[in-house]
Amino acid sequence: IPAFDLILECSAEPSVLAGYDGLPDYVVNTNLMGTGNCLEAARLHGANMVFLSTSRVYPIETINKLNCEEGETRFELSIEQTVSGIGPRGLDETFPLEGGRSLYGTTKLCSEFLLQEYIAMYGMKGVINRCGGLTGPWQMGKVDQGVVVHWAAQHVFGGELAYIGYGGMGKQVRDVLHVEDLYDLINFQLEQLDKHNGKVYNVGGGREVSLSLLE
């Protein structure tokens, strides 16, 4: 491998449904072992890493039990909650991590821990971005990943759509981040990597760029 000074680690099997077919080793080998290989390459070359993690590191059941209020087109988070790390703007980085989160989310969280160990042990510099819903050109949307492009394509080409879960009304909400905005963020972090070294950030579009499936 030619010399390099940075790895942008965004490779993964990104489906939350991956592994439910009885093949968990594929997800573990692709996501966790893949990150391990990238970290070793970075260590041997004296390189740093920007790791694109996921909002799926947060446990599914805990999220599903959050107090919500039902509006005409979407669910809104209630002010009163029984867990920390949640507010009107959504989840922050202090949200509890105990519980199940899918093999995808678990392997990405374990990859975060690996990066933090490499930072501590080998003096590598790195930053972790827990991305929410990303979208933009060349996203190949499908049922289990790339929801914005998938839904847009189904509307354009007259495909079938169904609301799954949460009462089947399509009121569940996700915020969306364009890939160009993610690019700007990464550039900003790299310009002052010492400041962001070892930090974990939730990365999304925020309430201003959020929508429900129904909307």
Where are the predicted features?
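Glycine/proline-rich active-site loop of Rossmann-fold NAD(P)-dependent oxidoreductases
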Residues: 109, 122, 135-150, 163-167, ...
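PAPS/PAP-binding and catalytic site of the sulfotransferase fold
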Residues: 210-215
